[in-house]
Amino acid sequence: MDKVLLGALEAGGTKMVCATGYADGTVVESQSFPTTTPEETTATCAAWFKDKGIAALGIGAFGPTAVNPTSPRYGQILETPKTAWRYFDLLGNLQGPLGVPCGYDTDVNVACLGEVTFGCAQGLTDVVYLTIGTGVGAGVLSGGKLVHGMMHPEAGHIPLVPDPRDPIANDGACPYHKNCLEGLVAGPAIAKRWNGKKGSEMADDPEAMDLLAGYLGQALAVYILCYAPQRIIIGGGVGDHTPIVPLSRAKTAEVLNNYIVTPEVADLDTYIVNNSLDGKQGVMGCLELARQALEA
């Protein structure tokens, strides 16, 4: 299996990352394409993979998307703000031209899978992977399996208590929920609050980082209470390029208020951590998803 060439596709709202590699997580080749129309984008990606001779493909898609194989909409993008992509059959438009087994899940679930298989969550059975960038999404591993249920978790949209210091309190950037985590900490919220600036441009502003870390701490406390993970891993542009992760530890502890007493939560420095695979966790998770599809 280690010598069988596999395909990986991170399907994002702004770009598609196509890659080939092996079951041990080694990435052989990768190339990014802009996300344009559904038809053009999938045709470009399928053509790129067609020449590589892959045996299977793992797809991690932006969401919401239908990840339950028994659903009649399995493989489709669902109620996304990207209107042209709503109810587009992403899986079918890739698997059809390629004719190889395909694994399909969300982008954050495959990132979680990457960390569990190759990164800082190896050996763990219960993990939350959170990405904070243009949006906020969470991948959840419970009992050694990625959580799906009726669909995948949408934990980036949990409602939060607005901070009275916040100029966009009750008017966050999420078009669906004004005071959800995504609406208050993702890139568009940062830009709305601070005159178009990026998270990295606000990284040295203590008050700004304290505000964002407070929101993240609220959310992480909820994830701990609901999912009881053995580790929480955070990635994405805002997560990687600001001090929000270390600052959120004290905020999380404040919300929990000593209610959870476990060895893991006692050491938040090793419990709430940044991603460990240098941004490759999504692609590497897709390779693992492809391996699973080939062996199914």
Predicted regions: what is each one?
Residues G103, N109:
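Glycine/small-residue-rich loop that forms an oxyanion/phosphate-binding "nest" at active or ligand-binding sites
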Residues V136-A138:
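Active-site histidine-anchored catalytic micro-motif
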